[in-house]
């Protein structure tokens, strides 16, 4: 029905804009959130910061079309193995829909953080 149409519309428009699903500590250390890499920061913002910074969009639940644009140092961004569509589904469902961990068994045993 209607929810399916909204979901498909959001996926079709945002899947192209979002390059990678990432994990970042936000709004403070020790609290993690899903974000989407939208590009590498360029121009004045990059030139003012001492680190290489990435554009990370932090969506709101259940509507991932609104959210926050954060400029986060690359070293503080963890790339996830889930696809963009899986990440959007996770956000839209409020975490009810959670994709399987696609990493190898050995990688699962090594915490990144």
What are the functions of these language-model segments?
Residues 1-14:
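Transmembrane alpha-helices and immediately adjacent membrane-cytoplasm interface residues
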Residues 17-113:
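Terminal membrane-proximal soluble interaction domains of membrane-associated proteins
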């Amino acid at each position: 029905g209607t929810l399916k149409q909204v979901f498909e519309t959001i996926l079709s428009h945002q899947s192209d804009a979002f390059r990678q699903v990432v994990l970042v500590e936000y709004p403070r250390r020790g609290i993690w959130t899903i974000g989407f890499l939208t590009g590498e920061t360029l121009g004045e913002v990059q030139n003012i910061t001492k680190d290489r910074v990435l554009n990370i969009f932090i969506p709101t639940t259940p509507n991932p079309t609104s959210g926050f644009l954060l400029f986060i140092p690359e070293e503080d961004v963890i790339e996830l193995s889930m696809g963009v569509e899986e990440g959007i589904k996770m956000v839209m469902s409020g975490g009810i829909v959670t994709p399987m961990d696609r990493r190898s068994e050995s990688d699962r045993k090594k915490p990144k953080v």
